[in-house]
């Protein structure tokens, strides 16, 4: 019986050593996982920062291009900081908003009608071929544009370029 008890105690010691060894391995693996997590979080922060910088540059470039498209010169835009570019666009947006509020629904209706007629005209022209289009479209659109321009001038407002630009 003492031999069996001794064998059981030996086996218990072996199991205890195995458990301690596995515990140490798990502890080491857990430390490695924590270290990997910290490294991944650091890389994620760097990636997010890089992405933000790229997007910011892209947004800044797009805003600068918008100013160029709105009539600013390259020299004007090049010397502006990003904040000045954004401020200029905000000012333009505010002016457009104020101008939009000055337009009556008659203006908006005329603008929509002109745009829709131009769209229909070009669809009609495309379907008939570039050389064969109904010249009546041209007259109707020009009449509407004239009416729109007169309304703008009567109110002392500047007609919107995309409405009155016509290449028939």
UniProtKB/Swiss-Prot annotation:
The keyword Coiled coil applies. It comes from the Bacteria. The keyword Coiled coil applies. Residues 1-53 form a coiled coil. Keywords: Coiled coil. This is SPbeta prophage-derived uncharacterized protein YonX.
